[in-house]
């Protein structure tokens, strides 16, 4: 007779790596052109002046300056823009 029970198997034990999404530079902070402002899935934040959009919806600065967050349009969409440094 067996001295130990047979080892069971499980279908658990996997998880995906976190994608480190979110705001990387907050309102009022200085930023350099090309720096990432927000990493996101979909356009939770929309691009404003001096802000570009990557193919994965990442928002990045097109000019050096100060990051600003706010809303725009009739639908009050969350928007990010960069006030260019003079």
From Swiss-Prot:
NCBIfam families xrefs: L27
GO molecular function, one term: structural constituent of ribosome
The gene coding this protein: rpmA
Family assignment from sequence similarity: Belongs to the bacterial ribosomal protein bL27 family.
Bias kind Gly residues: ranges: 1-10
Region (Disordered) location: 1-20
Protein name: Large ribosomal subunit protein bL27
Keyword ATP-binding: no
GO cellular component: cytosolic large ribosomal subunit
PROSITE patterns attached to this UniProt entry: RIBOSOMAL_L27
PANTHER family documented for this protein: LARGE RIBOSOMAL SUBUNIT PROTEIN BL27M (PTHR15893:SF0), RIBOSOMAL PROTEIN L27 (PTHR15893)
Domain of life: Bacteria
UniProt source species: Bordetella avium (strain 197N)
């Amino acid at each position: 007779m067996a001295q130990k029970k047979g080892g069971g198997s499980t279908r658990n034990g996997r998880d995906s790596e976190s994608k480190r999404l979110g705001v990387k530079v907050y309102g009022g902070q200085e930023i350099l052109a090309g720096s990432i402002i927000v990493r996101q899935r979909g356009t939770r934040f929309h691009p404003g002046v001096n802000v570009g959009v990557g193919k994965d919806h990442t928002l990045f600065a097109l000019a050096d300056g100060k990051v600003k967050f706010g809303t725009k349009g009739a639908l009050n969409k969350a928007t990010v823009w960069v006030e260019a440094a003079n």
